[in-house]
Amino acid sequence: MSAKLERLSQTLRDVLGDVVESLVVDRGEVTIEVAAGNFLDVARRLRDEAALGFEQLMDISGIDYSAFGNGAWQGKRFASVAHLLSVKNNWRLRLRVFADDDDFPVLGSLVEVWPSANWFEREAFDLYGILYAGHPDLRRILTDYGFVGHPFRKDFPISGYVEMRYDPEQGRVVYQPVTIEPRENTPRIVREENYGDVGHG
């Protein structure tokens, strides 16, 4: 581990203490995990503590862990991951929090801490169904009006539930049940002796 990452890790331990449930340094990045109940308090401290100074939110991602490790995952299903930047210290940090309820995932909104969280949280809500309590305008941002479900969830069918097409008789776009037959989507890799002409020329 580099001296820079060691210094960041130690500063996080010193400032946040026991509220950090997990601190992992992997592939040159630091990830901390906190409980949902401590999420907003930790976010404010990461921003406001002079020793840390994570004044910039770079991104928020939703994650569905239900099929992680080929289904061997035993933890909570939905997580939200915030990617933070301290310009002053030239540090990057990943802050991960799991929603307590797999059936109705709710987390606190980071919009009051970092206003740039607005559209990122809307995206995670739209694609994963993670609700952000306190968000000023939590509505879909990428899918169509009236879209049913959350397409990045692992249990969402690849072909979806409905398809749309233009109906010339009605002069508009109409929705109808999916007509595509479901299929197993298993990648095939060609393993021929001279595949790709490797080693020739």
Swiss-Prot record:
The Swiss-Prot or TrEMBL record annotates one GO molecular function as: NADH:ubiquinone reductase (non-electrogenic) activity
Enzyme Commission numbers on file? 7.1.1.-
Query: What name goes with this protein?
Result: NADH-quinone oxidoreductase subunit C
Give the principal location in a single coarse category: membrane
Name the enzyme's class.
translocase
Q: Which cell locations does it reside in?
A: Cell inner membrane
Oligomeric state and interaction partners are given as: NDH-1 is composed of 14 different subunits. Subunits NuoB, C, D, E, F, and G constitute the peripheral sector of the complex.
One short Pfam family name for this protein? Complex1_30kDa
